[in-house]
Regions:
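Extracellular/secretory-pathway and virion-surface proteins
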Residues: 20-414
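Bacterial Sec-dependent N-terminal signal peptides
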Residues: 1-28
Length: 414
C-alpha cells in the first residue's frame, strides 16, 4: 500500500513539474519547395505577348514578355525556430551577355504589386516628381510597398550554352588555369530574416534583364530546416520594405542618384528590438569609364545621420573566370618571370584578359550580391527618414547607361 502511495505522489510530482516547465512545441519537420526547375527567362513576345501571361500546368506566371517568372508557393507556418536557405541556379540558353538578375518576393501587405500591375488591375502610385522624378515604384506609396529582393545576382557571360569544349565561339578562349567551363552557376544565401514574407503563401519570382529570345534557364529552391529542440519558439520578425530601384516592370534605368539623393519615410513601432537595415547595391554602366568600372561612394543615412559610408566594390572577378566562356578577351603584354632550362629568366609575353576579370561596383559576372547589414542600436519608436546618396554617380548619356540598383529593407523582432 505504501509503495502505491509513493508511486502516486511521484507521478503527481512529475506531472506538476511538466506543467510548470516549458511547453514542448510540436514539430512540423523540414520542408523543401522546388519553385522553378530549368524554367526559361527570356524576352519572347511571340510566346508571351502580354505584360501578363496566365500560368499553365506548371503554375508559373510569365510577366513582361517572359523576362519575369513568378509562382505562388506555400510554406508551413512553423512554431519552432527555422533556418531558411535560398538556392538559385542559372545557365545561359543562348544569351551570351552578363545581365542583372533579381530573385524577389511580393510583400503580402501591399495591395499593389508586380502581378496585379501586369494584369492591368493596378498601377504604381503617383510620385512627387520634385523628389523622385519619374521613378515610380521605388519607394512606398498609397497601398504599395516596394518589392523585396531575396537575392541579387549577375549572370555570367554565356555559362552553359557556350560551355562545350568544341564550341565555335569559346573553344580558344579558355585560359590555361581553367580545366573546363562550368555548365551553370549556383548561389546560396541565408534568408531566414525574410521568412515572415514567405510563411503561409507568397508570390516569389526571378527577373533577368535579358532582351534575347533565347535568354536563360533558371532554377530556384527554398529549404526550411526546423529546430530540433523541443522548446525553441519561433523568433517573430517583421520586414519593412524601404526602397527598390530594380526596373522590373514599366520602370526605367535608375540614374536618379546622379542628380539627387533619394529618401523615404518609415515608422518604428514601440516595443520592437534588434532593428537591422539590409542594403543591397550594384553599380552599372558597361562602357569605358562607366559607373560599373569606377569606384563610387555610397552614403546611407537615417534622419540625416550616416549609418553606412562605403565604396561597394569587387576586385576578385577573375575568380569567376570558369563561369564566363563567352566573355570578350584582350591580350595584355607584360614582362613575365618564368623557369627556363638554365634557371629563372624573364621575357615579354601576351596574356589573355577577360572582360569578366575586371573589377566592378559590388559585383562580378557570375556572382551573387550579399546585403550590407547595419544594426540600428539607437533608433527610437516613431517616424524616421531613410536616405541614399551616391554623390559621384553619373547620368545616362545616350547609350552610356549608368545607373544604380539599390534595394533596402528593415528587419526587427517583435
Amino acid at each position: 500500500m505504501m509503495k502505491k502511495i509513493v508511486l502516486l505522489f511521484s507521478l503527481a510530482g512529475a506531472l506538476l513539474l511538466t506543467a510548470c516547465g516549458p511547453r514542448e512545441i510540436p514539430a512540423k519537420g523540414d520542408f523543401t519547395v522546388r519553385v522553378f526547375d530549368d524554367t526559361p527567362v527570356r524576352f519572347a513576345p511571340d510566346i508571351y505577348p502580354e505584360a501578363y501571361n496566365a500560368p499553365g500546368a506548371d503554375s508559373i506566371y510569365h510577366l513582361v514578355n517572359g523576362r519575369i517568372i513568378l509562382k505562388k508557393i506555400t510554406l508551413p507556418e512553423y512554431e519552432r525556430n527555422v533556418f531558411v536557405k535560398l538556392k538559385v541556379t542559372i545557365a545561359s540558353n543562348g544569351d551570351r551577355w552578363d545581365k542583372s538578375g533579381s530573385c524577389f518576393v511580393l510583400p503580402k501587405e501591399s495591395g499593389i504589386n508586380l502581378l496585379n500591375i501586369a494584369k492591368g488591375e493596378k498601377q504604381f502610385p503617383e510620385v512627387d516628381s520634385t523628389k523622385l522624378e519619374h521613378m515610380v515604384g521605388i519607394v512606398a506609396g498609397e497601398d504599395y510597398k516596394p518589392t523585396v529582393e531575396l537575392m541579387r545576382f549577375m549572370t555570367p557571360f554565356g555559362v552553359g550554352h557556350f560551355s562545350a569544349p568544341d564550341d565555335s565561339l569559346t573553344h580558344n578562349r579558355k585560359p590555361v588555369y581553367i580545366d573546363h567551363w562550368e555548365d551553370s552557376v549556383s548561389w546560396e544565401q541565408d534568408i531566414t530574416d525574410l521568412y515572415p514574407l514567405l510563411e503561409g503563401g507568397a508570390y516569389v519570382g526571378i527577373f533577368i534583364d535579358t532582351w534575347t529570345t533565347e535568354g536563360y534557364i533558371a532554377s530556384m529552391t527554398v529549404d526550411v530546416d526546423e529546430s530540433g529542440l523541443a522548446y525553441d519558439p519561433l523568433t517573430r520578425r517583421h520586414v519593412e520594405p524601404l526602397m527598390n530601384t530594380v526596373y522590373y516592370e514599366g520602370q526605367t534605368y535608375p540614374d536618379i542618384f546622379a542628380r539627387r539623393d533619394v529618401s523615404t519615410d518609415f515608422e518604428i513601432p514601440a516595443g520592437v528590438r534588434n532593428v537591422r537595415l539590409k542594403y543591397i547595391v550594384t553599380g552599372h554602366g558597361g562602357h569605358s569609364g562607366g559607373d560599373e568600372f569606377v569606384e563610387k561612394r555610397n552614403i546611407v543615412s537615417i534622419d540625416g545621420k550616416e549609418v553606412l559610408n562605403f565604396i561597394p566594390w569587387r576586385s576578385d572577378c577573375a575568380s569567376f573566370r570558369r563561369f564566363n566562356p563567352a566573355t570578350g578577351v584582350w591580350l595584355k603584354e607584360r614582362l613575365a618571370s618564368y623557369i627556363a632550362k638554365d634557371g629563372y629568366s624573364e621575357k615579354k609575353v601576351e596574356e589573355p584578359l577577360g572582360s569578366s576579370d575586371l573589377s566592378r561596383s559590388n559585383w562580378c559576372p557570375g556572382s551573387d550580391v550579399m546585403p550590407e547589414e547595419i544594426l540600428l542600436t539607437d533608433i527610437a519608436p516613431g517616424k524616421h527618414t531613410f536616405t541614399v546618396s551616391i554623390p559621384e554617380a553619373t547620368e545616362i548619356d545616350g547609350n552610356k547607361l549608368n545607373h544604380w540598383l539599390v534595394s533596402a529593407y528593415l528587419v526587427w523582432e517583435k
